[in-house]
């Protein structure tokens, strides 16, 4: 291998975001502000509002990025615009010095715009994240399709803003269609544009094809007469229609025009050029919309600019519509200009747009890759429900621009892509990729890189992995090159024009971290790239023995490591801060991030790498971040791996691991959970934060302080109180028993109920920090609206059920953690850390893991680390295999361990069984692989329930861990029990364990009383089915079938029952008992009122008198 890992240095991975936002601040914002009308008429006589957009001022906000995240606020800049209210003595449109009576000028706040942080993200309402968009480029497109045995040709003009204009040709002639309106004749269209016959004759090259269909179109016009004036206005009004600079450049190029880029509407020359192109278009090849020539990137700067345009239009409309002024009120600029229109437009984009999303901060690689994502969805883009396979497929023009490997595996496959490692975006939004110039077969590496768009690639371009000598000359006489971005041709080496700059130029950052990538199947490489982004930062991370060389740049460009801004000498180092004294004698303090939660609840923590007295250079990494070691990306651990079966524990991708990983905390990670509560105003009164909680023992409140908040540093378990909170009770909240006790004995139940914040189920850990956002109230520490956040740090060790993976898509779930003394061991006594299934390699075709595993073993024995670029065949055939065999030989010789390399079975070693000490029959492949712990922890997913909430409609247990739901027993599980004939188990599962309401209560009573479990009744889901069938108009009758008596079992009796009205006797008895309880309660209440008692006695006496009177009358 050659010594220099890269032919040229990689560009900054986050430069695209920063440059786009800088363009917005310097040019985009001022352009949109200058588009405002300088003088606006107000709905008050002789009053004008004058704006000064050239003099706008940006003022920084009062918060920092860290405070903005903690306080759920926005980190941004405020825009102030000078505005002047002019009182005139006459009704003129433009005020002059003569007719001015008074001027009031002041700077007005018109809105706030989020500011990009140093890591390339935005913080809006405490959340950070966004995504770039790839859309169809505005301009002219030709399409031909076969429809109803006819060729239908269309030329479409796509605008940056406004309607689409289509020119169509069919068997009846030439037509024009605006948006999806009815088509109109091309002659009517020209007439609507006020173009006369002379201009048509002089402007068009040939008019004969149009005249051929004129009579037919005039006949068809009688039945087709849309509102022509309104349609024409759609493409002529500059306020609603704009081609944009890109659309104008595209139109000029396609039509051979030279119209200024400042003209953003269609001119007469454009119309004539389009018609001429249309008439001769059938000789052209239809445009490919998936070609990157016809697609461009809308980076964040352009997206925010378009939102500002919407906001400023709303602001102008808002000023014009203001009518709430009386004649006596003195109007000031700040009363006319409102900041809400712009603020709401910006908030819409960051909060509810398809391009705005929650930033993936699982590790620093996932954050970097997230910022380089390109989405084809969103406003103006594709619809995920109606996307063709061609739109998702890899296009030849994506070479070196978009990664062909890294994309989501779900419904967004191919629609969300990632920028390639060397790609950059030019000022027009087109993706460029760099090349070296080649002259007479020599690569001119000393000359600057040449960046080309897909449009400019009309030359012969060679890939980076072709063979070359030490002087930079191409070795082979003939080379396979790309020509015009699509065709592959064999070219003499002296006729090659350009060559790619690096082997990893075509792939993304995540994919380029996979060593021996060329030996993996593309599907597994995709999984490997995606799973690296899911790796959890470990407590003790280690750099990979086998890497690709860009690990340090990924860590550096993420800005999650602390970097020295100036050279100097370290004066002070602690876990919280590093002080460096620079050459000028100034002391620079670098604050370190300590145990802060990320968006995915992983731990963001920095560790110092320098010591007092050390000399520091500019750009040196002085503190490691999460998932880094010594300034390099370190997401996992180097483990000793054996590929062998072990008693079925690694069947179907299951993985067997040693308990040494837990003992040495190799896969231990910290996760920080956030629990929050808020003081609210309820219907019954205001909630109170307190340590005095009713019906809660002192033992359960011992960890709370005097205010009722948990103390920092305490270890908490599920159900423990974090914040004591009580809520006033209402009359409705009281139980009938409590009301009865109160009525008879005067016993008072507490007027407050416990609504404390408790530790959720499945979470235990140490209280790390508490954030209190107070809204004080007279006499109270915490008023309504006060928030309290408790952060709990949970240490997560490796356990059965956790998901781990390599970098080649080889993933699996831990099936058993075996004592390290029972694991197979090497001849030198080293026990194996992890056992993988050898059947997982040939079918998945990810042989790269075998190369990595063996080179890692050689590196571990030689105490060396390797940086291997993919596609190494440029140096020698089978270069990877030759390198690994050579390094294993060197390790065996240097360490005096001949068993490390065997000529008969290279890479295989004869292992011994840790339980018996006996050697296995066959040699086993053993090596050192880099293994990651993924963010699919069994601790977050495992769940069990005995009783809990039920669905209101079906009366079945709800689903999901978050709702404390049950495990779904679906139809396939039912089939399994039916196959075994487990009738009683099945009946129990489908009735009393599911939705038999009466049966559930009866079973509970029988278990408490020690009685036999009764038979189940009809489940609620059957009743729901009956109601649904009745709703469809079906009259369904149900019968209860029974024998006439025990002796005569041949005679059956069918009794009709109504399930909707008649319930079991137990339910009726329950209803009767509830009615009796209500009667007793009513009597108890009446006992309190003497007047009611008297009236009751009177009523009884009257009843008795009437009864005796009737009896005497009967006797007579």
UniProtKB/Swiss-Prot annotation:
It comes from the Eukaryota. Pfam families: RNA_pol_Rpb2_2, RNA_pol_Rpb2_3, RNA_pol_Rpb2_45, RNA_pol_Rpb2_6, RNA_pol_Rpb2_7. GO terms for biological process: DNA-templated transcription. Keywords: Chloroplast, DNA-directed RNA polymerase, Nucleotidyltransferase, Plastid, Transcription, Transferase. Residues 1101-1116 have a biased composition (Basic residues). InterPro entries: DNA-dir_RNA_pol_bsu_ext_1_sf, DNA-dir_RNA_pol_bsu_external_1, DNA-dir_RNA_pol_su2, DNA-dir_RNAP_su2_dom, DNA-dir_RNAP_su2_hyb_sf, RNA_pol_bsu_bac, RNA_pol_bsu_CS, RNA_pol_Rpb2_2. One of its GO terms (molecular function) is DNA binding. It is found in: Plastid, Chloroplast. Its EC number is 2.7.7.6. Residues 1070-1116 are annotated as: Disordered. GO terms for cellular component: chloroplast; DNA-directed RNA polymerase complex; mitochondrion. It catalyses: RNA(n) + a ribonucleoside 5'-triphosphate = RNA(n+1) + diphosphate. Residues 1070-1100 have a biased composition (Basic and acidic residues). Belongs to the RNA polymerase beta chain family. PANTHER family: DNA-DIRECTED RNA POLYMERASE I SUBUNIT 2. HAMAP family: RNApol_bact_RpoB (MF_01321). DNA-dependent RNA polymerase catalyzes the transcription of DNA into RNA using the four ribonucleoside triphosphates as substrates. In plastids the minimal PEP RNA polymerase catalytic core is composed of four subunits: alpha, beta, beta', and beta''. When a (nuclear-encoded) sigma factor is associated with the core the holoenzyme is formed, which can initiate transcription. This is DNA-directed RNA polymerase subunit beta. It comes from Heterosigma akashiwo (Chromophytic alga). The gene is rpoB.
């Amino acid at each position: 291998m050659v010594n220099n890992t890269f032919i040229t240095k990689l560009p900054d991975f986050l430069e695209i975001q920063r440059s786009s936002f800088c363009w917005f601040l310097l040019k985009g914002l001022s352009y949109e502000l200058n588009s405002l009308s300088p003088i606006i008429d107000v709905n008050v006589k002789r009053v004008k509002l004058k704006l000064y957009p050239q003099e706008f001022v940006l003022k920084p906000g009062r918060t920092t990025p860290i405070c903005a995240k903690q306080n759920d606020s926005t980190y941004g800049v405020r825009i102030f615009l000078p505005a002047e209210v002019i009182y005139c003595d006459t009704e003129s449109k433009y005020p002059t010095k003569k007719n001015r009576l008074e001027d009031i000028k002041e700077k007005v706040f018109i809105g706030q715009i989020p500011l990009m942080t140093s890591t390339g993200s935005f913080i809006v309402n405490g959340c950070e994240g966004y995504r770039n968009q790839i859309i169809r480029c505005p301009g002219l497109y030709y399409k031909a399709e076969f429809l109803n045995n006819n060729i239908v040709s269309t030329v479409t003009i796509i605008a940056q803003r406004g309607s689409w204009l289509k020119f169509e040709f069919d068997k009846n002639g030439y037509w024009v269609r605006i948006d999806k309106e009815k088509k109109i004749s091309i002659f009517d269209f020209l007439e609507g544009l006020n173009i006369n016959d002379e201009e048509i004759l002089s402007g068009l090259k040939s008019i004969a094809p149009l005249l051929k269909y004129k009579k037919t179109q005039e006949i068809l016009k009688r039945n087709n007469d849309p509102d022509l004036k309104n349609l024409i206005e759609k493409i002529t009004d500059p306020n609603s229609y704009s081609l944009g600079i890109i659309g104008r450049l595209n139109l000029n190029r396609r039509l051979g025009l030279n119209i200024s880029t400042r003209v953003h509407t269609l001119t007469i020359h454009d119309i004539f050029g389009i018609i001429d192109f249309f008439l001769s278009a059938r000789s052209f090849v239809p445009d490919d919309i998936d070609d990157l020539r016809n697609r461009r990137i809308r980076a964040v700067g352009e997206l925010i600019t378009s939102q500002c345009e919407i906001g400023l239009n709303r602001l102008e409309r808002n000023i014009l519509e203001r009518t709430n002024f009386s004649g006596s009120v003195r109007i000031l600029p700040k009363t006319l200009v409102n900041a809400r229109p712009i603020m709401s437009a910006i908030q819409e984009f960051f909060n509810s747009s398809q391009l705005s999303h929650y930033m993936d901060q699982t590790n620093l690689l996932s954050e970097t890759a997230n910022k380089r994502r390109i989405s084809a969805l969103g406003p103006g883009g594709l619809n995920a429900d109606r996307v063709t396979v061609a739109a998702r497929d890899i296009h030849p023009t994506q070479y070196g621009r978009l990664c062909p490997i890294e994309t989501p595996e779900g419904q967004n496959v191919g629609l969300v892509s990632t920028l390639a490692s060397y790609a950059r975006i030019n000022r027009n939004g087109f993706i460029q990729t760099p090349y070296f110039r080649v002259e007479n077969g020599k690569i001119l590496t000393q000359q600057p890189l040449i960046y080309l768009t897909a449009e400019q690639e009309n030359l012969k371009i060679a890939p980076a992995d072709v063979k070359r000598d030490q002087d930079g000359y191409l070795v082979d006489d003939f080379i396979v090159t790309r020509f015009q971005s699509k065709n592959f041709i064999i070219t003499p080496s002296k006729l090659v024009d350009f060559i790619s700059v690096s082997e990893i130029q075509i792939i993304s950052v995540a994919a380029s971290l996979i060593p021996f990538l060329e030996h993996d199947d593309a599907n597994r490489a995709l999984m490997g790239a995606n799973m690296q982004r899911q790796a959890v930062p470990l407590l003790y991370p280690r750099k990979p023995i086998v890497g690709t060389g860009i690990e340090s740049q990924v860590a550096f460009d993420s800005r999650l490591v602390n970097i020295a801004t100036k050279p100097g000498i370290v004066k002070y180092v602690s876990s919280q801060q590093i002080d460096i004294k620079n050459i000028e004698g100034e002391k620079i303090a670098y604050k370190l991030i300590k145990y802060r939660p990320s968006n995915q609840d992983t731990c963001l923590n920095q560790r110092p790498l320098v010591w007092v007295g050390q000399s520091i250079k500019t750009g040196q990494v002085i503190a490691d971040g999460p998932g880094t070691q010594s300034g390099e990306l370190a997401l996992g651990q180097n483990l000793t791996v054996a590929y062998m079966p072990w008693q079925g524990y690694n069947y179907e991708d299951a993985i067997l691991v040693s308990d040494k990983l837990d003992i040495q905390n190799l896969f231990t990670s910290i996760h920080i959970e956030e629990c929050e509560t808020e003081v609210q105003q309820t219907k019954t009164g205001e909630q109170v934060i307190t340590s005095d909680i009713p019906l809660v023992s002192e033992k359960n409140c011992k960890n709370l302080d005097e205010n009722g908040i948990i103390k920092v540093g305490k270890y908490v378990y599920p159900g423990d109180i974090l914040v004591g909170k009580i809520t006033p009770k209402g009359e409705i909240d009281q139980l009938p028993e409590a009301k009865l006790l109160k009525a008879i004995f005067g016993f008072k139940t507490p007027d407050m109920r416990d609504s404390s914040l408790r530790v959720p189920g499945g979470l235990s850990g140490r209280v790390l920090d508490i954030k209190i956002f107070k809204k004080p109230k007279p006499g109270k520490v915490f008023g309504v609206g006060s928030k309290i956040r408790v952060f709990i740090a949970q240490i997560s060790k490796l356990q059965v059920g956790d998901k781990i993976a390599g970098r080649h898509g080889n993933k699996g779930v831990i099936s058993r953690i075996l004592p390290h003394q029972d694991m197979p061991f090497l001849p030198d006594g080293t026990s194996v850390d992890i056992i993988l299934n050898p059947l997982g390699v040939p079918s998945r075709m990810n042989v790269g893991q075998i190369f990595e595993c063996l080179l890692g073993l050689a590196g571990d024995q030689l105490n060396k680390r390797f940086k291997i670029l993919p596609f190494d065949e440029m140096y020698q055939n089978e270069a990877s295999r030759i390198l690994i065999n050579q390094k294993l030989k060197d390790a065996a010789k240097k360490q005096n361990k001949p068993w490390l390399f065997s000529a008969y079975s290279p890479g295989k070693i004869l292992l011994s069984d840790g339980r018996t000490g006996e050697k296995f029959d066959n040699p086993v492949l053993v090596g050192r692989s880099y293994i990651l712990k993924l963010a699919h922890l069994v601790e977050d997913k495992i769940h069990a329930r005995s009783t809990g909430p039920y669905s209101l409609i079906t009366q079945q247990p709800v689903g999901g861990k978050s709702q404390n739901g049950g495990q779904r027993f679906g139809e396939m599980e039912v089939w399994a029990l039916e196959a075994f004939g487990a009738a009683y188990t099945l009946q129990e599962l489908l009735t009393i364990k599911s939705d038999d309401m009466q049966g559930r209560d009866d079973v509970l009573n029988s278990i408490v009383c020690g009685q036999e479990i009764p038979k189940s009744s009809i489940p609620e889901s059957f009743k729901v089915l009956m109601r649904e069938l009745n709703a469809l108009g079906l009259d369904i009758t149900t019968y209860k079938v029974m024998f006439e008596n025990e002796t005569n079992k041949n005679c059956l009796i069918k009794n009709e029952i109504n399930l909707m009205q008649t319930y079991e006797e137990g339910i009726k008895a329950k209803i009767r008992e509830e009615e009796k309880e209500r009667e007793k309660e009513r009597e108890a209440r009446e006992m309190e009122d003497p007047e009611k008692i008297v009236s009751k006695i009177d009523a009884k006496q009257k009843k008795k008198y009437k009864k005796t009177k009737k009896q005497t009358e009967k006797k007579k």
